[in-house]
Amino acid sequence: MPARPIPVPLLALALAAALAVPSPAAAARVKELADVVGVRENALYGYGLVVGLAGTGDSERVLFTQQSVAGMLGRLGIRIDPKDVRARNVAAVMVTARLPPFARPGTRIDVAVASMGNARSLAGGLLLVTPLAGGDGKVYAVGQGPVQVAGYDAGAGGAELRKNTPTSGRVAGGAAVERAVDFALGQAPLVLALRRPDLTTASRLAAAVNAKLGAGTARAVDPAAVELSPPAARKDDVVGFLAEIELLEVEADQRARVVVSERTGTVVAGEGVRLRPVAVAHGGLQVRVQRDPAVSQPAPFGAGRTVEATRDRAAATEAAGGVVALPATASVQDLARALDLLGASPRDLVAVLEAIRAAGALDAELEVLE
């Protein structure tokens, strides 16, 4: 049945092509879908000084930098009043790092450095010895080394030239692990935590483990967790047991979702997104969407075969307004094809999708990014 026109906005759809075409779900390894509870990174932080700056460090107005310099010199046997510190080649910084799971003493990790005062640039600076503590207050690593900055800040006579953010940088391999996190596999119940909780995925994961290692090995506790019970013969080989599970392939499921970024104009439609029949009035353009069945016949005496296809047509004309019904479309892609011919703004596209969802005609979650 031919479609009737529907008013839609005049906008520029820079990315209607970004709408995903539904496709069969692909299986993924368990290690891409879940993590072992307790096996995770830990955040480290510390306060330090960066020296060797070419006059781009903190000014004397930053009192904590003066106090830090005086305190550091005091530990070296040099006594000085913090008020007398006038060094512009020093900057107070906050140092952060990520402690990988199972990191042993001596392991090198990267650290991030960010200025806390009014330093203009950390380029060319050297991070002095900085203890890095965890949330429990214990020191797990010590950082030190040259700071690498992906930017610059130069100026003279009131003119200034800046690129990126020169007040933050990194020290590659700049920290040595001094203490390992107290955790051992097998001491606590083994649980896999899904990165994207889903009842179907959790059930499929447990079924795949039981099919491979025997019934009762895995049990889906909730959408986010699968509890593992190693067989008696594998209790002393927890690492091998988990490694075998990590390589299993599971077809992950997820809720249908449309993600829209109004700022960049990016639109991504996940698998399973569908539209119901809906009437929309927005702006002063009419969009006609029509999908006709078609048959592709091979040439006489050819080696091909007859296949079923669809012929999509979309047209747009300016109208004075009015509301008419849009026939059911198979997916968001059909709506995108119609809008793609118009040239419509991402802001109006977001409004259309939100209105369709509010009307109950979008069988998916709509997530609008800032």
Curated annotation (Swiss-Prot):
Superkingdom, natural source: Bacteria
Pfam family, one: FlgI
Keyword line: Bacterial flagellum, Periplasm, Signal
One GO cellular component, as annotated: bacterial-type flagellum basal body, distal rod, P ring
SS bond partners: none
Signal peptide residues on this chain, from the entry's feature table: 1-27
UniProt main location, coarse: periplasm
Localization of this protein: Periplasm; Bacterial flagellum basal body
Gene Ontology molecular functions: structural molecule activity
Biological process (GO), any one: bacterial-type flagellum-dependent cell motility
Described purpose of this protein according to its UniProt entry: Assembles around the rod to form the L-ring and probably protects the motor/basal body from shearing forces during rotation.
UniProt xrefs under HAMAP family: FlgI (MF_00416)
NCBIfam families referenced in this protein's UniProt entry, alphabetically: PRK05303.1 (NF003676)
PANTHER family xref list: FLAGELLAR P-RING PERIPLASMIC PROTEIN FLGI, FLAGELLAR P-RING PROTEIN
Quaternary structure annotation from Swiss-Prot or TrEMBL: The basal body constitutes a major portion of the flagellar organelle and consists of four rings (L,P,S, and M) mounted on a central rod.
Family: Belongs to the FlgI family.
Protein name: Flagellar P-ring protein
Gene name, Swiss-Prot/TrEMBL: flgI
